[in-house]
């Protein structure tokens, strides 16, 4: 079933310029709707960890992108909160009290999640935004005015602080989603975009900006990473001097490494303030 679905999505992607809400064949509509439904329930996800590596299911991401070519904008409500005009329904628009009880997570008004996103048990959505294709795992807090971009993968027991921006894959078009692994803390107003991976047990301080071109400097080893924060890193905003010493450019600095045991026992303030 999955292989046939993947083949149909891949072919539709090749023919995407010819697709429109009026011209799309029913089999393509049904295939895309099937994928979005399985993303919504958590049965499918855009990226999965296999061993130590993340594997991106590009065909699922293609289905998310195709969904925008198959629907016209239409008026819709977010649980009676307001009227909107969009292609993608909100996740909770038609949910009952039983649906919320079975799902087992909290949603604080006026949080919005789009249909096709998955929210796991014991997660908390403060007034925030979760886009289509995103996966928010168990016990994670999405704090006030944080945004989880399209197809982003957020692990277990993650804290996305107020105003955090997790980039998506739709605009601008990205090859891979942002991934925040288990037990990470992302400080207020930080941004993680362009498919950057923050590995497990890492702490990102307030106001750190991470993209594929951002230098991530390990002050203990002198090593520079791109696109990946190693597991157990404590990261703050910083600068590195130019080769001629005339100016400096923004970077992120790994000030120390901690293991999971230390991370669990030590307060965030101690980790960020300690030498």
UniProtKB/Swiss-Prot annotation:
PROSITE patterns found in the cross-reference section: HEXAPEP_TRANSFERASES (PS00101)
GO molecular function: 2,3,4,5-tetrahydropyridine-2,6-dicarboxylate N-succinyltransferase activity; nucleotidyltransferase activity
Coarse class of the protein's main subcellular location: cytoplasm
UniProt-recorded name of the protein: 2,3,4,5-tetrahydropyridine-2,6-dicarboxylate N-succinyltransferase
This protein's record includes keyword Cytoplasm: yes
Subunit text: Homotrimer.
E.C. designation(s): 2.3.1.117
Organism: Cupriavidus necator (strain ATCC 17699 / DSM 428 / KCTC 22496 / NCIMB 10442 / H16 / Stanier 337)
GO CC annotation: cytoplasm
């Amino acid at each position: 079933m999955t292989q046939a679905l993947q083949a149909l999505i891949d072919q539709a992607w090749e023919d995407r310029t010819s697709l429109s809400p009026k011209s799309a064949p029913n089999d393509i509509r049904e295939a895309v709707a099937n994928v979005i439904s399985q993303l919504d329930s958590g049965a499918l996800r855009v990226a999965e960890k296999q061993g130590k590596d993340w594997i991106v299911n590009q065909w699922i991401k293609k289905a998310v992108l195709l969904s925008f070519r198959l629907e016209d904008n239409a008026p819709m409500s977010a649980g009676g909160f307001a009227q909107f005009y969009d292609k993608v329904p909100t996740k909770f628009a038609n949910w009952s009290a039983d649906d919320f009880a079975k799902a087992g997570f909290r949603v604080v008004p006026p949080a919005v999640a789009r249909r096709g996103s998955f929210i796991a048990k014991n997660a908390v959505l403060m007034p925030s935004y979760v886009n289509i294709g995103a996966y928010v795992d168990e016990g994670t807090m999405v704090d006030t005015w944080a945004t989880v971009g399209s197809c982003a993968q957020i692990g277990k027991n993650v804290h996305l602080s107020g105003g955090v921006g997790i980039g998506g894959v739709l605009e601008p078009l990205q090859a891979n989603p942002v991934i925040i692994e288990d037990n990470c803390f992302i400080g207020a107003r930080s941004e993680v975009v362009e498919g950057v991976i923050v590995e497990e047990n890492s702490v990102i301080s307030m106001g750190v900006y991470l993209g594929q071109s951002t230098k991530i400097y390990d002050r203990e080893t002198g090593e520079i990473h791109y696109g990946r924060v190693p597991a157990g890193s404590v990261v703050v905003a910083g600068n590195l001097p130019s080769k001629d010493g005339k100016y400096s450019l923004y970077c992120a600095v790994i000030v120390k490494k901690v293991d999971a045991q230390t991370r669990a026992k030590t307060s965030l303030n101690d980790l960020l303030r300690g030498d």
